[in-house]
A protein has these predicted regions:
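Periplasmic-binding protein-like
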Residues: 64, 117-126, 184-186, 218, ...
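Glycine-rich phosphate-binding loop signature in dinucleotide/nucleotide-binding domains
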Residues: 44, 115-118, 178, 234-240, ...
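N-terminal helix-turn-helix DNA-binding module of bacterial transcription factors
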Residues: 1-58
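Hinge/beta->alpha junction and helix N-cap segments in small-molecule ligand-binding domains
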Residues: 67-77, 95-105, 160-170, 186-207, ...
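Alpha-helical recognition/docking segments in bacterial nutrient-uptake
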Residues: 58-173, 236, 340
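Flexible loop/turn connectors
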Residues: 232-340
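Short acidic capping loops at alpha-helix termini that bridge into adjacent secondary structure
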Residues: 182, 213-215, 266-272
């Protein structure tokens, strides 16, 4: 005998309209009701082909990775690490580009959820502000887990990202232990939280060591040209730091290349440290020391968090989880003094 929605309603005590919404995977339904209805449908041998997303979830998790994709090694390395993590977790990851996310992401995500192909989403859009995330809460249903990989103060969505404060702190500590006392920094865009965290960690370590001085700062923008400009600004300022922390690898590469063109030796005249440990650091001459961010580790933590939301937990808001970072030392830093 053909199983109908009426049979499931009789089995569970829920209304036919509630059962229809659960089987269609639309609307906001409690996790308890959703699970009871799906279990009843399975017991009664209701055709799984009529349950939205059922077959997909049984085989693998379909994850949408939503980002405002930009040219360059950073995004390529980020996606490569996330894809390797998805493979390890037996999930399927799709890279989806949303241009101008602050204007378009609400409709983009609403349409994506309505298509019923993806089970959950990862958002990596560093341009989004708190008000943008608050707007997203209005379009994300409870049954559709979403995690952000972009840092903001006082997270709105569940957020998993790297510990930028620790990265900045470790950078200053490496300089100190290597014998450098007069140091400088090329910052990232002040509007981006990760830039501020890296700077604050660096500055706090220096402030806690009276014999160490931050003698030069430059406001960069994470782009190659700001690395070039920062070198010329440093030379014009005559501040003469012994070591410089550049808050991403692209600026660090530009700084080192410009130094070499101007007959300034790295590391003999000045030590350099970047951030993210992209492939360019290994391929440069000299090779560049960098704060390593493990994108595969980030991906594993993010996908496991998404999996843990099924079937009972739904979305968790405002939780920030930080992935540890470390430093990879290469030719751009040398030991200036013997350390006891």
């Amino acid at each position: 005998m053909k199983v109908t929605l009426k049979d499931i309603a009789k089995e569970t005590g829920y209304s036919i309209s509630t059962i229809s919404r659960v089987l269609s995977n639309v609307g906001k339904i409690s996790s308890k009701a959703r699970e009871e209805i799906l279990q009843a449908a399975q017991r009664l041998n209701y055709p799984t082909s009529r349950i939205a997303g059922y077959e997909i979830r049984k085989k693998h998790l379909n994850i949408a990775l939503i980002t405002d994709f930009h040219e360059g090694e950073f995004y390529a390395s980020y996606y490569y690490g996330m894809d390797r993590a998805a493979t390890a977790e037996k999930a399927r990851l799709s890279l989806l580009n949303v241009p101008d996310p602050s204007r378009n992401i609400n409709k983009f995500l609403s349409d994506l959820i309505a298509d019923k192909y993806y089970d959950c989403a990862i958002i990596f859009a560093t341009e989004l502000l708190r008000k943008d995330y608050e707007g997203l809460l209005e379009v994300i249903p409870d049954h559709f887990p979403v995690v952000s990989n972009a840092l903001i103060e006082n997270s709105v969505l569940s957020t998993i990202t790297f510990d930028g404060y620790s990265g900045g702190h470790q950078a200053a500590r490496l300089f100190y232990k290597s014998g450098y006392r007069r140091v400088g920094i090329v910052k990232g865009p002040v509007i981006k939280a990760e830039s501020r965290f890296r700077y604050n960690g660096f500055k706090d370590y220096i402030d806690s060591h009276p014999d160490m001085d931050l003698v030069w700062e430059f406001q960069g923008d994470f782009q190659f040209n700001s690395g070039v400009q920062s070198f010329h600004d440093m030379m014009d300022s005559a501040k003469e730091p012994e070591a410089v922390f550049l808050c991403n690898d692209l600026m660090a590469t530009a700084f080192v290349d410009t130094a070499m063109v101007n007959n300034v030796s790295v590391p003999d005249d000045i030590a350099v440290l970047g951030y993210d440990d992209l492939p360019m650091c290994r391929h440069n001459n000299p090779t560049i020391s960098s704060v390593r961010t493990d994108f595969q580790q980030l991906g594993l933590a993010t996908i496991q968090a998404l999996k843990n939301r099924f079937p009972d937990n739904g979305n968790q808001h405002g939780i920030l989880s930080l992935i540890p970072v470390s430093i990879i030392e290469r030719e751009s830093i040398r030991l200036k003094i013997a350390v006891a």
